[in-house]
Amino acid sequence: MPWKYFDVMSMNSDQPLLKTTIKVDDIISLRSRSKVTRCVGVLILIAMVLWSVKVTIFEDTDWERMGSIGQVLTSAGRFMGIDFSLVPNLLVPAIETFMISCLGTLLGVIICVPATWFGARNITPFKPITYPIGRLLMSISRSIHEIVWALFFVAVLGLGALPGIFAIAVRSVGFIAKMSAEAIENVELGPADAIRATGANNFQVLLFAILPQVLPQVLGIILFEWEINIRRSAILGLVGAGGLGLVFFRQMNTFNHHGVTTVIIAILGIIMIGEVISHYTRNRVI
């Protein structure tokens, strides 16, 4: 049986027109290998999913302690109610939670200024040294969970809102600085070159040429992180960092199930208020 061929014409900017002959059987062979590779990949993925289900659901779950479906529903039913006597005592922790997120985000933005300056490739003052330092600060902030930061600051500063503020601030640096640095790296360099030609240093270039271009985008990043920080600040109280999370922890320890539900509703209310404020601010400023 004669071979079937395709004539493939290729053009290179540095070379004249070339003509290459490819066998049809070679194309079929390549496609078959690609299908085999995909099938093997799918089988590996299915095996990993089945193994994960086996380990997490069947081996690590205490089914005897969980009981029947009726017992599970009975346990869940204990939380169906509100402790109205607790409501007046939630105002101060709710305000504290809100202020932890605000002050933590503000402090994080302040810390982000040098981290962003160092971590943006096109404005970093001394690239071989400052650029790795800036990127390292971002990586450390993002790689450590806010609960771990809160535990660290509680151990250093004691219980209260202050450890929560510092934990929120340090955790915010990674996201805000990284996204801001990437926005700065994509700006038009014409205004920066013009200001630099007048003798301005890198910080002045950042302040007067770069920042006006990226300010709307940076404000959007900060508002987005602030929304997340409201959720974080509500949870940090579980490790003693103040706010509604601390009240939640106490209700759990005293087995006040209706109190737990009341605190959860308060947390949801704070989050929704934060979303409304963020949406309104974004529409007015950005």
Where are the predicted features?
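Glycine-rich helix-loop "coupling/hinge" segments at transmembrane-helix boundaries
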Residues: 155, 229-267, 286
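Membrane-cytosol interface at the C-terminal ends of specific transmembrane alpha-helices
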Residues: 159-225, 276
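N-terminal, non-cleaved signal-anchor transmembrane helix
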Residues: 2-106, 113-114, 118, 122, ...
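Alpha-helical membrane-protein architecture signal
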Residues: 87, 91, 95, 126-133, ...
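Cytoplasmic-entry segments and transmembrane alpha-helices of multi-pass inner-membrane transporters
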Residues: 115-150, 179-182
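Generic hydrophobic transmembrane alpha-helix motif, especially the helices
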Residues: 138-172
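Hydrophobic positions within alpha-helical transmembrane segments of bacterial inner-membrane proteins
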Residues: 105-113, 117, 121, 147, ...
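C-terminal transmembrane helix and the adjacent membrane-cytosol boundary/short C-terminal tail
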Residues: 220, 261-286
